Amino acid sequence: MVKQGKLGSVSSKLTLYVGILIVLILSITSAVAYFGSKENSFRLLKESQFKLMDDTLKTFNIYTGFKRNAMTVLASQIGHLDHLDEDEIYELLEMTLKTAEFGEVFFASEQNAKTYLSNRTSLSLTQLNFKTRPWYEKTKQEGKLIATEPYKNATDGKTVITYTVPVIHNGTFVGIVGGDLNLAAVSDQILMMGRTAESYSQAISPNGDILFHEEEEKILSKTTLSENIANAIKANPHLLDDDNDETLFYVKGNDGKAQAIMCDLTFNPYFRICTITAESSYSKASNKILFQQVITGLVAIIVALILVRILIARNL
């Protein structure tokens, strides 16, 4: 009986010591695996968010690049007309309106002080004094295409940006062509490309104005999130640098919860394309990995202890 008691005591001690060793080994390996998986999960989520931002940015640049090119072509075509014939001007305006899908296309003529519209009407200088408009003065002065900041069109109340290009005829400046891009009309097309189960995209101005939204009345409005994003970039402009790898930053959202943000510039510096992911998406992925590691570790420890107990008992 004494011998059996001693053997049982030795067996228990060996099981305890080996068990502690196994727990330590499995704990260390599980911790290493957890932190490795957590880092990998964070990297994948970050890469996914970056790709979403990049895809949205490319879509925006391609879409607006087509509009800019259409205005440049129109300016060249009008500049090559022999006598700046009104019928030919209207035809070119109509064609550009249809092919480039602008809300309105116009030609502001320096020679006769008239603004020709794509609906085949014209405005006199008393109806529209384009010469006093900032976009006209800036385009004439710089001699190149410009894009205005978003503004509400006085004629229909739509929020637009206007692309303008100087028209040169026989070496002489004769006016400016312009096209109005309705932001509400393109919001769905741009935002559709920037949405996943975890993230969505937004275009935000340097002042925190929302520039794209499915609901037209919310364009040019501000939210807590949009203002916080704008303020974070003002405080650290390097967040927009292409060569900055640490472009992910966090701000409070409209609900007070942390949001993971990435932003980049477009051709138009007034537009910043940002992707937004709830910070909880990153923490949920980490928590899921931790839970899996804990369950796996506990099962492995229990199985190992049982096997050790059996092996020790058989050999004593």
Task: Mark where each language-model region is.
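Extracellular/periplasmic juxtamembrane segments that couple receptor/chemosensory ectodomains to their
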Residues: 225-293
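Extracytoplasmic/periplasmic ligand-binding sensor regions of membrane-associated signaling proteins
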Residues: 98-99, 116-193, 197-200, 252
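Extracytoplasmic/periplasmic sensor domains and loops in membrane signaling proteins
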Residues: 91-92, 119-151, 216-250
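Extreme N-terminal signal-anchor transmembrane helix of membrane signaling/transducer proteins, especially
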Residues: 3-39, 43, 294-306
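Short glycine-/small-residue motifs
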Residues: 175-176, 213, 272
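Short hydrophobic alpha-helical segments used for membrane anchoring or interfacial signaling
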Residues: 105-112, 200-210
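Juxtamembrane interface helices immediately C-terminal to a transmembrane segment
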Residues: 15-16, 33-63, 85, 282, ...
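Extracytoplasmic/periplasmic sensory segments of membrane signal-transduction proteins
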Residues: 47-146
